Amino acid sequence: MVPDSTTILHHSITLNLFSDYHSHPQGHRVQRYTQALLQPWIDSARAKGILDIAFTDHDRYHGGVDFDELDRLRERNPDVRIRAGIELDNDPETSAAGRKWVEQNWKRLDFVLGSVHYLNRADQMFDSVPEGAQQFTGRDIDDVYSDYFRRVREMAASGLIDCLAHLDLVKIHGYRPRAQVTELVEETLELIRARNLAIELSTAGWRKPVNELYPSDEIILFAMEKKIPFTIASDAHSWAQLGENYERLRQKITSFGLREVCVYEKHKRIVRRL
């Protein structure tokens, strides 16, 4: 279901982080989409120069997503490209229902993120702060990383996503493997490339204990070598967090020599130069 074609649009613009492709208007509970809920997100995005935004609530809250309400929001805000999205997770309790919902609504969705938040505990996301750190205590960290990236590959192979979210989320609590992370992630990057998927550059890591961009510099450069495309995102759980730390992200992107990011419309990847 992931498209094969890529449209490239060339724009002569100054480096401008114009998109945010990971946002959660519902937060951490079901809240039915309404204009009152969504319009503040568009107002915040516009004020920050973000004119292409994807709403990607967690799939377990798909009951709150209303495509007709998104159409009304687009009519009210023709200057902002508003994408219908979802974040598909590996939650042991809800992922089956989430995948079914994505399949049923694929044609109405513009963009699907894939993520891994669960390891060996079905009752707790490993990235919960601070309690999730307990899942790393006493374990071989290289084994944890290997297990995590195995689950990421399962998500990448699902055929139901366009992009991988916070690719090295496993580092969130600051635990580091003994092996080079590029060795641990190479098989995953090869699959991402083979499946024609993108990787998200997420500023959310800067507000977590690890205090780093997702993914790491090493992984970004490795992905660039493999010509894997990127989206940019804040993983905002409130409208105030949209575009958070984008100035730091701009500096990173400049240092990497990265000059294009991608956006999506009905799962068609559009590469835009910065």
Annotate the PLM regions.
Residues 3-92, 96-104, 171-183, 187, ...:
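An N-terminally biased module of ancient metal coordination in phosphate/nucleic-acid-related enzymes
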Residues 45, 112, 166, 199, ...:
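Conserved, mostly hydrophobic/aromatic
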Residues 46, 156-157, 224, 254:
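Non-catalytic positions within long, well-ordered alpha-helices that form the structural scaffold/packing
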Residues 51-52, 110, 162, 259:
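Short acidic/polar active-site loop segments enriched in Thr and Asp
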Residues 65-195:
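Extended substrate/RNA-proximal surfaces in nucleic-acid metabolism proteins
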Residues 180-242, 259:
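Active-site-adjacent C-terminal substructures of enzyme catalytic domains
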Residues 227-232, 247-269:
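His/Asp/Glu-enriched, well-ordered alpha-helical/loop segment
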